[in-house]
């Protein structure tokens, strides 16, 4: 009689172990995103995305209290419990050392929550924090490993970062300024080398000026909803047809793959009959209402502009099509001749004409980043 060893694989049931999609994306966007919120600031940002239907979300933190305060399912929270209840404080090295030991567990959590149907991963963080700034590099590495695992190539172009810069008040702390300067510099280098795409910069000091009367309670919620909301508009409209001009999903994907920094903005158009109204609004948008500033727009490699208005506006405003075309041409000129992808959409709920702008492939805003050095002691 032959003595054949029993193998564990004999008990493997392919039907039973087939990976299930544990969380379904509900954003309705052209691309399926998985969102990772690193640290307190990143967790808040991830929660804003989660509320807009980006349900493939994981929050990662070294402090249990920060995770407890996030209203997302507990199984979508990952505690790097290396430093007790208080987490890493502002110590990024501490957080980095802690998450490196948990790399495999983080990867397993990605597999569990994200499943296999993901087009891109977006990692959100505040660059000055311990948890966010300290864990981001390991999270980027794990995100790329995850894409390789599910059989997707060009992984560098599929992992993006949303990084927020601290307010001037926060930067008055030398530790905050040092963390922010070092981490943002490093992320910009990764983006410019095409190792991540895109790097979306959010300048909390700039946004504070856009919303000068915000209460403390509403400040972070408003900022994060603005960021996630703007991002969501482009993803959703790229999934919708228009009887005027459709913003194509392939064009949207190509913009998201550009190496370098990306900025977003929105503004409404006044005096619609004026032939320069749309171009003036776009110019104002690029100069005033973007979520970060200090960029040389002529370094852009890609841009998108979407105009949204009601049926009444499109039907009754004489010469509006020419004005919109002139606006698109203005954006192309301001961005150094970058390819501008266009969209014109009707929305019954809009009683005004609104322009949404996305500019990608930008070189870093050196002056803003270097400005953090003045706070260093």
Describe the function of each predicted region.
Residues 1-377:
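Tubulin/FtsZ superfamily GTPase core signature
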């Amino acid at each position: 009689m032959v003595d054949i060893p029993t193998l564990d694989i004999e008990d493997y049931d392919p039907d039973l172990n087939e990976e299930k999609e544990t969380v379904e994306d509900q954003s309705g966007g052209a691309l399926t995103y998985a969102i990772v919120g690193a640290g307190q600031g990143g967790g808040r940002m991830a929660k804003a995305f989660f509320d807009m239907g980006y349900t493939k979300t994981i929050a990662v933190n070294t402090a249990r209290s920060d995770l407890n305060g996030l209203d997302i399912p507990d199984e979508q929270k990952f505690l790097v419990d290396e430093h007790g209840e208080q987490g890493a404080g502002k110590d990024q090295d501490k957080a980095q050392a802690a998450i490196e030991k948990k790399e495999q567990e983080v990867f397993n959590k990605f597999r569990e929550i994200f499943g296999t149907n993901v087009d891109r991963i977006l990692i959100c963080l505040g660059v000055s924090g311990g948890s966010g700034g300290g864990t981001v590099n390991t999270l980027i590495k794990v995100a790329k490993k995850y894409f390789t695992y599910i059989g997707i190539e060009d992984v560098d172009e599929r992992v993006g970062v949303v990084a927020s810069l601290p307010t001037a008040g926060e930067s008055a702390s030398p530790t905050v300024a040092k963390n922010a300067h070092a981490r943002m510099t490093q992320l910009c280098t990764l983006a410019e080398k095409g190792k991540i795409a895109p790097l979306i910069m959010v300048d909390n000091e700039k946004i504070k000026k856009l919303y000068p009367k915000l209460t403390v309670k509403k400040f972070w919620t408003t900022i994060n909803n603005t960021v996630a909301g703007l991002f969501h508009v482009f993803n959703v409209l790229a999934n919708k047809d228009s009887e005027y001009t459709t913003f194509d999903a392939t064009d949207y994907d190509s913009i998201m793959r550009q190496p370098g920094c990306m900025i977003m903005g929105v503004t409404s158009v006044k005096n619609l009959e004026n032939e320069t109204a749309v171009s003036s609004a776009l110019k104002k948008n690029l100069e005033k209402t973007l979520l970060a500033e200090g960029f040389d727009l002529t370094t852009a490699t890609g841009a998108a502009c979407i105009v949204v208005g009601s049926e009444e506006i499109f039907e009754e405003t004489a010469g509006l099509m020419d004005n919109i075309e002139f606006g698109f041409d203005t954006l192309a000129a301001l961005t150094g001749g970058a390819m501008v992808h266009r969209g014109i959409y009707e929305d019954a709920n809009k009683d005004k004409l609104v322009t949404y702008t996305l500019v990608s492939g930008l070189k870093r805003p050196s002056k803003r980043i270097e400005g953090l050095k003045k706070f260093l002691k």
